[in-house]
Amino acid sequence: MKTGVKKLKVHVKKNDMVTVISGNDKGKSGKVLRVYPVKGRVIVEGVNIRKRHMRPTQSSPQGQIIEREFPVHASNVKKG
């Protein structure tokens, strides 16, 4: 029985310039901010932006809605 998690080979690295080749953001390009080799996903600057609702805290008592990049699958991006 094997233990541990298998990492997938991801063809891009942090700070590479990539272009999205499929999905809602097809044709957009940006810099890779982070790579998740275990899940085979990457976060690309300015791509797959979603709204995230943040709870109220002492620093922001009303809470807030922030927009941030979410991961896309590595097979949906190409270098260049």
Swiss-Prot record:
**Gene Ontology cellular-component annotations:** ribonucleoprotein complex; ribosome
What GO terms describe the biological role, i.e. biological process, of this protein?
Answer: translation
Transmembrane residue ranges: none
Molecular function (Gene Ontology), one example: rRNA binding
- InterPro entries tied to this protein: KOW (IPR005824), Rib_uL2_dom2 (IPR014722), Ribosomal_uL24 (IPR003256), Ribosomal_uL24_CS (IPR005825), Ribosomal_uL24_KOW (IPR041988), Translation_prot_SH3-like_sf (IPR008991)
| Pfam families hit by this protein | KOW (PF00467), ribosomal_L24 (PF17136)
Q: Which UniProt keywords apply?
A: Ribonucleoprotein, Ribosomal protein, RNA-binding, rRNA-binding
Output the Gene3D superfamilies linked to this UniProt entry: 2.30.30.30
Could you confirm whether the keyword Ribosomal protein appears in this record? Answer: yes
Q: Which SUPFAM superfamilies match?
A: Translation proteins SH3-like domain
* Signal peptide range: none
Q: How does it assemble?
A: Part of the 50S ribosomal subunit.
> Member of which family?
Belongs to the universal ribosomal protein uL24 family.
Chain's role? One of two assembly initiator proteins, it binds directly to the 5'-end of the 23S rRNA, where it nucleates assembly of the 50S subunit. One of the proteins that surrounds the polypeptide exit tunnel on the outside of the subunit.
Name of the protein: Large ribosomal subunit protein uL24
Tell me the name of the encoding gene. rplX
